[in-house]
Amino acid sequence: MADGTQRIGTERSGAERMDAEEGETAEEGEAVGVRRFWEQLGLPGLVDVHTHFMPESVLKKVWAYFDGLGPLTGGVEWPITYRAEEDERLGMLREFGVRAFTAMLYPHKPGMAEWLNQWAVDFARRTPDCLHTATLFPEPGVAEYVRRALDDGARVFKAHVQVGAYDPADALLDPAWGVLAEAGTPVVIHCGSGPSPGKHTGPEPVGRVLARHPRLRLVIAHTGMPEYEDFLDLAERFGEVRLDTTMAFTDFSEEFAPFPRRALPRLAGRPRPDLSTRLAGRPRPDPSPRLADPPRLAGLGDRILLGTDFPNIPYPYEHQLRALERLGLGEDWLRAVCHDNGARLFGL
């Protein structure tokens, strides 16, 4: 990040994570750091709306794509930090204190989404702390299988415009967007042009979708990286649009897609009365007066959600949290982003 950013705490170095306490494994040491982060904020844990679980055969292909520096990586080296079996990855999130997470899965061709959704039903049944996730693709019958996924208990959808190489405003998707808008079900959508642009990435296609479905609860993945300000514009125009923090503000992403510091006040605003007071039993001070509401609407402080991209990240999980912390937007903002906003959205 640029010089002058503020840290509320200190991120532990790799060596410190390895040797945090005598007898700790590296994983245990990292869990201590993550838990310390949210405990110091008085939170009951974290709500992470952007984590990836999918059939093992698919996930291994995703990892191989990153290893091979496929075109959509933008040619950036991307070592997978949490390359492990499913049970181990689930155990890591639980050790970190992530009380709710997702299984972001996505098709790259027709005929794949419904199969992924069937897998997700079983995964949700055996993983109660995972928010039941489903996906979609522009193809005949998409509205019908979206309805079936909702009937099966889906609580969040994933759309990946970059990987799927489709226009989100495709007429085939229009009925499905209508179903999801009517249901009030959030859709985490990778629609920004990072780390590599696609034919249909960027704010314009998403703007056309929202013009037709203004109540659609889109969660813009990666804060819209690198078109951050354009997607903030959309969030300010459409009250149900949210943004997740996935990979944004980290040292890794700042190298190729730095977040403009002039836009930081737009992320703030004043969070709504938080849930963590009730859940953690801790009193909360009044919001800091220096975080006054930006002039456009009341700010987006209650519509920014924690996302990380676990396990497919090239740095430790804790780094995403510390990257948010060092923005200097205050502890109330961190509580809202890392827990309360997601808990409210999903009724946790």
What are these regions (language model features)?
Residues 83-93, 115, 139-149:
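Short, acidic/polar
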Residues 155-159, 166-304:
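Catalytic pocket-lining loop regions of alpha/beta-barrel enzymes
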Residues 90-93, 97-112, 119-137, 158:
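Short, well-structured secondary-structure segments
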Residues 50, 120, 149, 157, ...:
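Conserved, mostly hydrophobic/aromatic
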